[in-house]
Amino acid sequence: MAEPSAPESKHKSSLNSSPWSGLMALGNSRHGHHGPGAQCAHKAAGGAAPPKPAPAGLSGGLSQPAGWQSLLSFTILFLAWLAGFSSRLFAVIRFESIIHEFDPWFNYRSTHHLASHGFYEFLNWFDERAWYPLGRIVGGTVYPGLMITAGLIHWILNTLNITVHIRDVCVFLAPTFSGLTSISTFLLTRELWNQGAGLLAACFIAIVPGYISRSVAGSFDNEGIAIFALQFTYYLWVKSVKTGSVFWTMCCCLSYFYMVSAWGGYVFIINLIPLHVFVLLLMQRYSKRVYIAYSTFYIVGLILSMQIPFVGFQPIRTSEHMAAAGVFALLQAYAFLQYLRDRLTKQEFQTLFFLGVSLAAGAVFLSVIYLTYTGYIAPWSGRFYSLWDTGYAKIHIPIIASVSEHQPTTWVSFFFDLHILVCTFPAGLWFCIKNINDERVFVALYAISAVYFAGVMVRLMLTLTPVVCMLSAIAFSNVFEHYLGDDMKRENPPVEDSSDEDDKRNQGNLYDKAGKVRKHATEQEKTEEGLGPNIKSIVTMLMLMLLMMFAVHCTWVTSNAYSSPSVVLASYNHDGTRNILDDFREAYFWLRQNTDEHARVMSWWDYGYQIAGMANRTTLVDNNTWNNSHIALVGKAMSSNETAAYKIMRTLDVDYVLVIFGGVIGYSGDDINKFLWMVRIAEGEHPKDIRESDYFTPQGEFRVDKAGSPTLLNCLMYKMSYYRFGEMQLDFRTPPGFDRTRNAEIGNKDIKFKHLEEAFTSEHWLVRIYKVKAPDNRETLDHKPRVTNIFPKQKYLSKKTTKRKRGYIKNKLVFKKGKKISKKTV
């Protein structure tokens, strides 16, 4: 097989100006133009001189291969954007324009507040409907990039007299940004390899399920715009390293600033870019371009990132950012030593080098230890520390482990979200390592680190998806380039690599790159003579079939797995008809219409954002999870018996309690299945009152039937979920009180409340709301009233028994008998 041409190589001159020749040259072209080097190479090969350029104009531009390539590239990118946007609209078509999941409801509520009251009111907004009685300062506790982006688009549309509701802007924001993600991925892959690979990468990321899962219409979450910012920042960084231009580096800093404002995953960037620079230093690939790019990026990016209120001084005071500072100091020391090496003798330089490195390393090490010990540098947060120690969160911080997105990724998830790209991704990585240069070192580090983090946490599959699309596109591009453009390669001799030209242009100012070994023409001919047209056709058809299966899989997964809003459920009958289960919105609307405006609703933290967003009522805890002790108090109330829970609810001024119960319809995401996490979180703060072992049977089982633990059968969560459920018989094959989710008959059917009363139960019993009774004006006496018997039955007592059991009067006064005074005494 012939060596793949390097992506930096200039575009080879084609033999004719037909559209097919332009299409074939697309895989080898980066910028779609013919330079003088290509023409000279063509003449050196003995070919005819290239045709003269056609007259200016549209027809003249399209008559050139570059014109056809530009048109073809634009068309493919437009179709990729259109396909990605269309495939994300299944939820809107099947249901309606609605916000999905949990976190997007808070983002939508914040964006609505921003659009209604302005930016400064948003920054100073104190949300009194969250975390009662504490409240929440929203402006300083969110990444505002998502809200500002949606609010800016809404303002522009209204300025142009295009009346659009802010909800529709939020719903369609992520599908729109998916097209920008495709373009940024195209630009990055083109810088890494060539234009053909970039177009394939753009098509892959437009429809891949790993990215669609967080960017469907209605998923108004930070990741919807953050992946675009991530890819665009990486593209500008690669551009900065290749050119050494301050302009591109400043653009990279601005893109990084937008990324910091949009998502907490910016920590991945501020650790991956320093890792890239550090590895380049280890590989002795230091250059002035790297020095200019990283020094400018770190200083300007650091200052810009600190302008986000939620980030503040974290870039200089947290352990997650210390690697970037260390690499910056190392780069300055390396550059200083490079400066001294040209002005000192070899012996003096070696002495100074070892002495300086020892002192600098010791000073940095002692400084880090001192600053960490004194608390100036904060240690790793629990969420980041759990990336290195996967069992840490489950033992020490159960609230982090309770989130499904923080669970380790299964092998099935990789194939489900990436399909055939999982298999072709290592091939693309091998091609990059085989033809290594500065930017390919970056993509190799990106791939390796993303694979590790995606394996540790399901949520980080999102960071793996872009690099898998890029490397898989490189692999497919090489295969198509070899099996479709073989003849043209043989007629066009290889030209010089642009990296070599860059070295010549800088006249030795840069390091000496290790160039790749090119095959001789005779060796290429021997290799390619064995490839007949049949083999080329078979391989090409196989590749096209794989791509077709990939497209079908992506569409099916998007339609069936990632296009269902969690607030509206759908089920299908045997005849194919669909049933809509709208219990969540039904219950939230009931709360909005039938409760006091200032009513306080207690529920588990999963539903806090939805209650505040749809019901507009005050909640005790929500999905922000910033106060673990407050969440543990709610978990303790749910895990305790009714009397103990009532005291907690009165302390927190709770008016209503909301629980999710799926025993009727078989909904597995209800509160009974989440109950053990409530117990674990409560046990972490109240170990004397709540113990997880009390909720298991002696055999260690968690059961809701008669064999279940008495503590479980009498706790508040169990009673609220199964109240009046023992009277319901779902079908003739199961007894009354049969739980379809856990496939068991409940153990406590005679449930009665003393301090609560049922206020609302949705149509399918999915949402149940209870009202907390006010305390009685006069406490009832627990003891029985005294009963008097007028005619008591007298029992015969013998004298012996009476003497033996003689009673006595407690504290009886003792009178001392006086003596008569005699005459003698006087």
Curated annotation (Swiss-Prot):
Catalytic activity: a di-trans,poly-cis-dolichyl diphosphooligosaccharide + L-asparaginyl-[protein] = N(4)-(oligosaccharide-(1->4)-N-acetyl-beta-D-glucosaminyl-(1->4)-N-acetyl-beta-D-glucosaminyl)-L-asparaginyl-[protein] + a di-trans,poly-cis-dolichyl diphosphate + H(+)
Region (Interacts with target acceptor peptide in protein substrate): 604-606
UniProt motif (DXD motif 2) ranges: 221-223
Lumenal side: 87-173, 213-223, 261-265, 314-321, 372-410, 457-460, 553-826
Subcellular location: Endoplasmic reticulum; Endoplasmic reticulum membrane
Keywords per UniProt: Acetylation, Congenital disorder of glycosylation, Endoplasmic reticulum, Glycoprotein, Glycosyltransferase, Magnesium, Manganese, Membrane, Metal-binding, Phosphoprotein, Transferase, Transmembrane, Transmembrane helix
Predominant location: endoplasmic reticulum
Membrane-protein topology: Multi-pass membrane protein
Name this protein carries in UniProt: Dolichyl-diphosphooligosaccharide--protein glycosyltransferase subunit STT3B
